[in-house]
A protein has these predicted regions:
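Histidine-bearing beta->alpha loop at or near hydrolase active sites
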Residues: 327-342, 354
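Accessory cap/linker subdomain of secreted extracellular hydrolases
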Residues: 156-287
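N-terminal cap/lid segment of alpha/beta-hydrolase-fold proteins
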Residues: 22-52, 267-271
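Alpha/beta-hydrolase active-site loop
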Residues: 98-118
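Conserved alpha/beta-hydrolase "acid-adjacent" motif
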Residues: 305-311
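Primarily recognizes the serine-hydrolase "nucleophile elbow" in alpha/beta-hydrolase
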Residues: 117, 122-179
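Short beta-strand element of the alpha/beta-hydrolase
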Residues: 51-61
């Protein structure tokens, strides 16, 4: 089960970490890796640096998994930026799991180190995938004077407390009701426990009509995807409870709908009370404010089994309330899967962000082809 969940993260979230320190001078570029305050990092500076720095924020990594510096997709992304003259900086963060708090601090520490060693960039941008998009957004909201723009990709840009309850917690709660003895209690989850994907698959196979109803309710394309999605969400819920000191989710006031028998489900589904301290932790890490002074361009795929597209659009509401809607643009790519962008699509989006910053030409919302 653990291998299956890890495979999801490695495939979708572009995780990149290093667990050693070394510096390797190269003829055409500078590459440096090391640690700052317990957070491994990697810096790449091309020989003909254009004086623009890109700070990259990686996605969720399961606590206890081995660091990986050689993710093929991230290597391609890094190489693409370097080939165009950009410096590229990555922090591995000093913690794993839902490490938004640590990641924002560690990313800023790495940026300061970069400036102290390689000089002040002409422009600095921050970008990231999945949970890295949350970190990107938190960074641009916290340090607006440092960055010229941000590109959060395929991440939940809504209230994390509400978003994780709506997608992660509620999916697990309702699955547990409809397919008994597959999930178990979601409060006081034992450390290291995992959801058994084989048991979940067997339950789905035994009730195909119910399975079809469930994936339609949660906009999952196929039944085969569901066990690994559930296992990943179970891990997120377990790890957040561990770091937050309790269960942050409360469904006592939730009225579930969209199922075959909503009345029966609402009568029978387990109800949970949130721990106030845990709830406050998730409020802080992170609830967007919409208070931005720099352009923010986000991109999402039209189908994402982990993060619904509406979670991207919700930042538009924050920006409207803050009076900053003109600084936020959401675009989409017609593709299936979490963070499933091509390198050309990513570079095209980044070019639009650069043009927005430099020429003050706000991109049109819509499709990136």
């Amino acid at each position: 089960v653990k291998k299956a969940v890890i495979a999801i993260i490695l495939s979708f979230c572009l995780i990149t970490l290093s667990a050693f320190a070394q510096e390797t001078p190269q003829a055409e570029k500078k590459e440096e890796s090391g640690q700052i305050n317990g957070a491994a990092f990697r810096l790449d500076v091309p020989a003909e640096w254009n004086k623009v720095l890109v700070m990259y924020c990686h996605g969720y990594q399961i606590a206890g998994t081995r660091p990986n510096l050689n993710d093929p997709r991230l290597n391609l992304l890094r190489s693409a930026f370097l080939s165009r003259g950009f410096a590229f900086a990555q922090s591995a963060y000093s913690a794993q799991g839902w490490a938004v708090k640590e990641a924002v601090e560690d990313t800023e520490a790495l940026r300061r180190y970069f400036v102290s060693k390689y000089g002040e960039p002409r422009e600095t941008y921050v970008m990231g995938h999945s949970m890295g998009a949350v970190i990107t957004l938190a960074t641009i909201e916290k340090y607006p004077e440092i960055y010229q723009g941000a590109m959060p990709l395929c991440g939940p840009l809504n209230s994390i407390l509400n978003g994780l309850q709506d997608r992660v917690f509620d999916m697990l709660v309702t699955f547990d009701y409809l397919f008994p003895e597959t999930v178990g209690s979601l409060a006081n989850v034992p450390k290291g426990s995992r959801l058994d994907t084989r048991k979940a698959k067997a339950a789905l196979d035994a009730a195909p009509e119910k399975a079809a109803m469930f994936i339609k309710r949660y906009s999952i394309a196929t039944v085969n995807e569901l066990p690994n999605v559930l296992a990943f969400f179970y891990e997120i819920n377990r790890e957040i409870q561990e770091r937050a000191g309790g269960n942050p989710f409360d469904n006592r006031n939730t009225i579930y709908d969209g199922f075959d028998d909503d009345a029966a489900l609402n009568r029978g589904v387990k109800r949970y009370t949130a721990d106030p301290k845990a709830r406050e932790y998730l409020r802080q890490y992170y609830t967007p404010t919409g208070h931005i002074t720099d352009p923010v361009l986000t991109v999402h795929t039209t189908y994402d089994q982990l993060v619904p597209g509406r979670y991207i659009s919700e930042y538009d509401s924050f920006a409207k309330l803050a009076g900053t809607q003109d600084l936020f643009v959401a675009k989409f790519v017609v593709a299936r899967g979490h963070c499933n962008f091509t390198i050309p699509q990513t570079l095209s989006a980044f070019d639009e962000l650069l043009n927005w910053v430099r020429a003050r030409k706000r991109p049109e919302a819509g499709e990136i082809k």
